[in-house]
UniProtKB/Swiss-Prot annotation:
It is found in: Cytoplasm. Its EC number is 6.1.1.7. This is Alanine--tRNA ligase. GO terms for molecular function: alanine-tRNA ligase activity; aminoacyl-tRNA deacylase activity; ATP binding; tRNA binding; zinc ion binding. It is an enzyme of class 6 (ligase). Zn(2+) binds at H562, H566, C675, H679.
Length: 883
């Protein structure tokens, strides 16, 4: 029986023999395509090949493509674990032709592989064709499929299109008949939704182009795109009707049972199925640098992870277990996908951190859910507000709540959940732009409706004239504002940049006839630029013409910091890996801040390398170019884009730096990003770049803060001044500071050792307080001693020394150093069966104002507050020994 790995290899090797290039799977995170959450089919990486935009060295290709369907319209998450064939992660086997062969070759290729290499009985196979595709019908007859097993389908199931317009064409599908013991009918029949006839391969014939009016013409370049689910064909070839009964899933399910100490099959099997599936999707996503968060791809990952973790808890797991399953996955899939082994440490660490975090709130969240649903019956609906509270307070994604209620037959009011989510986002949006409550935003919508949006002129100029179209004060429109008043000024056009994309808003001056205002900040909302202003003289009024001038020095500083973040982003990816993605930024006048996906602190060595690389490209002084193009053209150049950003028909692309192994049309551009901010004209205008440090921003996100230009130079001067002061204090040249410092540290360590030795000698010879000499009490040797100038950390060594000296006995030491009181008790090994050091300690510490303490029968330590009670403490220990 072939394994899943064998089947993958057989498929790829077969098409390699037919002249196909074996192409590696593209990443799950589509390169330069923020419109697509995850790669969900084999053709995604070849999209531009089919349209002719991308020309490759081959015209035939075959792949085993990693796919995830757990977000957007392709969302199988709710069904995963409960059905035989739903997965969040799956592999799509495919063969492709870009204007080379067509139906006459594609259909025989498929038939030969299935009936020859895979040895599937021909009488178990059915095929479908689009109802007008006579050519495909005849080819199927020619390869030997009886007419009664070739079914014409008139629905969209057998016609594929990339979008409302563009390449499209008919499909042909191959089905396997599992037998009449399973309910269901052939494709096109009333019972087609049953499980008897299962689609195993889909062949798409891209032969047409559809236009907006619905008309179609034949394409000059006709292509082939096919897809076969590896898990489905593996189930068939391994003699099962359920993907989760194939060799890979059996292995993962049994591993899940082992780490959760539960049974792999029976009533608990569904939990293991969920865990096995989600382990795959989460591990592959983390290996590509996707980390759990509350937005975008990171939130989808978090949803999948937490669903798996809940099912682990249903199996009785009270501690993190998902990370323990990663080695099992790597052992099964690591050979085909080396990125799993390379990222194993990151995957395990991310699982453990996320599960530890989630387990802290899981029980409380489930209690709230139980309380809220306790009176609900099958068919009832949980209020959306409750589901949102679970999400907002306890980190329960909506589908986790739905999954938890599935067994009770209770639905969730998803519209109510969406409404609560929307209300929170509006509140956050209003607060985020400094405009108060969400209700205040309505005034800006009204202005847009009446006056239109603001035209931004600031890319080309810092000075401009415009007309005041509205004034807003305290959330309401006003006609005018006088000296001393604060007001938001809205004009038809402006050179002032409105805060967005991490770049702060501009400041400057605005003058009108008879008045002036200082612009302290500029915000942007719904296409309006809000000039936050203080009227400094006279009066300004709606309808007035205005002259505007941006603060040039401040704008220049902001530009330098923004351009530096682009260079920093690229340098981070080069140093740490392609998983690095921007998660946030601040480009202010005095500093820059850049948040990025990375799961651990950046080493000093890497920080130095990153800083050097950025400064290299600053000194290169290359031109910074900006171009307007379509999003597709920008992605084709390799432009970095932020997932979740909505792009219009045109985008602004900022490029800088020359690198021999770069990107872009010439392959020599260092950094290319979609960006609406303002930038320097030459990289040299940044001046210099200094990293202040790296810190944690949130789970899986690091933050680098840095300076540029004059601020960076001033920082370096301050650091040089401090170094000169240190050198002077050490009586050394700056270049010799480290050597001198090391010598001082060595000298300090030697003195500390000498002091410790002297303290021990003094203590062993006697000290201040009673009981310095050993005495016989209750038939045991006892030594009680009060010591001044001895720290608590020295007591353990003194106890051991006294044990060696007296041979057999009980020791109590009370020490005071710098106002801190420490107590230690020791019992030699031969007496621990009769008396414990812990009991001696507990008897003594109350006299010095201490409580408790703890340790082992032979050694115990505690603390106190009042050294004057040392004699009483020793007497208390003696009393214990006397019995």
């Amino acid at each position: 029986m072939p394994s899943l790995n064998d089947i993958r290899s057989t498929f790829l090797n077969y098409f390699a023999k037919q002249g196909h290039e074996v192409v590696d799977s593209s990443p799950l995170v589509p390169r330069n395509d923020p419109t697509l959450m995850f790669t969900n089919s084999g053709m995604v990486q070849f999209k531009n090949c089919f349209t002719g935009v991308d020309r490759r060295d081959y015209v035939r290709a075959t792949t085993a493509q990693k796919c995830v369907r757990a977000g957007g319209k392709h969302n199988d998450l709710d069904n995963v674990g409960y059905t035989a064939r739903h997965h969040t992660f799956f592999e799509m086997l495919g063969n492709f032709s870009f204007g080379d062969y067509f139906k006459n070759e594609a259909i025989p290729f498929a038939w030969e592989l299935i009936t020859g290499e895979f040895d599937i009985p021909k009488d178990k196979l059915y095929t479908t064709v689009y109802h007008t595709d006579d050519e495909a019908f005849e080819i199927w007859k020619k390869v030997g499929v009886p007419e009664e097993r070739i079914i014409r389908i008139a629905t969209s199931d057998n016609f594929w299109q990339m979008g409302d317009t563009g390449p499209c064409g008919p499909c042909t599908e191959i089905f396997y008949d599992h037998g009449d013991h399973i309910w269901g009918g052939p494709p096109g029949s009333p019972e087609e939704d049953g499980d008897r006839f299962i689609e195993i391969w889909n062949l798409v014939f891209m032969q047409n182009e559809r236009f907006a009016d619905g008309s179609m013409v034949d394409l000059d370049m006709q292509s082939i795109d096919t897809g076969m689910g590896l898990e489905r064909i593996a189930a068939l070839l391994q003699g099962t009707h359920d993907n989760y009964e194939t060799d890979l899933f059996k292995y993962l399910i049994e591993a899940s049972a082992t780490v959760t100490k539960s049974e792999p099959y029976g009533d608990q099997n569904v939990h293991h199925r969920v865990i096995a599936d989600h382990l795959r999707s989460c591990s592959f996503l983390i290996a590509e640098g996707v980390l759990p968060s509350n937005e975008g791809r990171g939130y989808v990952l978090r949803r999948i992870m937490r669903r798996a973790m809940r099912h682990a808890s249903l199996l009785g797991a009270t501690d993190p277990v998902m990370h323990k399953l990663v080695p099992a996955l790597v052992s099964q899939m690591g050979a085909a996908y080396p990125e799993l082994g390379q990222g194993q440490a990151l995957i395990e660490e991310t699982f453990e951190q996320e599960e530890t975090r989630f387990l802290k709130t899981l029980d409380r969240g489930l209690k709230l859910l139980d309380d809220a649903s306790g009176d609900l019956e099958k068919g009832d609906v949980l209020p959306g507000e409750t589901a949102f509270k679970l999400y907002d307070t306890f980190g329960f994604p909506l589908d986790l709540t739905q999954d938890a209620l599935r067994a009770k037959g209770i639905e969730v009011d998803t519209d109510g959940f969406d409404a609560a989510m929307k209300a929170q986002k509006e509140q956050s949006r209003a607060g985020g732009i400094g405009l108060g409550d969400a209700t205040d935003v309505k005034v800006y919508f009204d202005i847009v409706d009446a006056e239109g949006t603001t035209e931004f002129l600031g890319y080309e100029t810092e000075k401009a004239e415009g007309q005041i179209v509205a004034l807003v004060k305290d959330g309401a429109r006003v006609d005018s504002a006088k000296a001393g008043e604060s007001v938001q000024i809205i004009l038809n056009q402006t050179p002032f940049y409105g805060e967005s994309g991490g770049q702060v808003g501009d400041s400057g001056m605005l003058t009108v006839e008879g008045g002036a205002a200082r612009i302290t900040d500029t915000k942007k909302v719904e296409g309006l630029f809000l000039h936050i202003a203080e009227v400094t003289e006279g009066e300004i009024a709606v309808g007035s013409g205005a002259a505007m001038e941006v603060d040039h020095v401040r704008r220049s500083q902001i530009r330098a910091n923004h351009s530096a973040t682009h260079l920093l982003h690229e340098a981070l990816r080069n140093a740490l890996g392609d998983h690095v993605a921007q998660k946030g930024s601040l480009n202010a006048a005095d500093r820059l801040r850049f948040d990025f996906s990375h799961n651990k602190a950046v080493s000093a060595e890497d920080l130095s390398k990153i800083s050097a690389e950025v400064n290299d490209f600053i000194r290169q002084n290359s031109a910074v170019s900006t171009r307007i193009m379509t999003p597709d053209d920008a992605r084709a150049l390799g432009a970095q884009a932020l997932f979740g950003e909505k792009y219009g028909e045109e985008v602004r692309v900022v490029s800088m730096g020359r690198a021999p192994t770069g990107k872009g049309a010439d392959g020599e551009t260092y950094s290319i990003e979609l960006c609406g901010g303002t930038h320097v004209k030459q990289t040299g205008d940044i001046g210099t770049f200094v990293i202040l440090g790296d810190s944690a921003s949130s789970a899986g996100v690091r933050r680098i803060e840095a300076l540029t230009g004059a601020a960076a130079f001033a920082h370096l001067e301050r650091e040089a001044g401090r170094m000169a002061e240190v050198a002077a204090s050490l009586k050394a040249q700056p270049a010799d500071v480290m050597e001198r410092l090391k010598a001082l540290m060595d000298e300090r360590k030697a003195l500390q050792n000498e002091i410790a030795t002297l303290k021990q000698q003094i203590a062993m010879g006697g000290g201040a307080g009673g009981g310095a000499e050993a005495k016989e009490i209750g038939g045991k040797t006892f030594l009680g001693q009060a010591l001044q100038g001895v720290s608590g950390k020295d007591l353990r060594g003194l106890i051991d020394a006294h044990k060696q000296k007296i041979g057999s006995g009980v020791i109590l030491l009370i020490a005071e150093d710098d106002g801190k009181v420490a107590v230690a008790a020791g019992v030699t090994d031969d007496l621990t069966g009769e008396i414990s050091a812990v009991d001696v300690l507990k008897a003594a510490v109350p006299a010095v104002g201490g409580k408790g303490g703890g340790g082992r029968p032979d050694m115990a330590q505690g603390g106190g507050k009042d050294f004057s009670g040392a004699d009483e403490a020793i007497k208390a220990a003696e009393a214990l020994l006397k019995g």
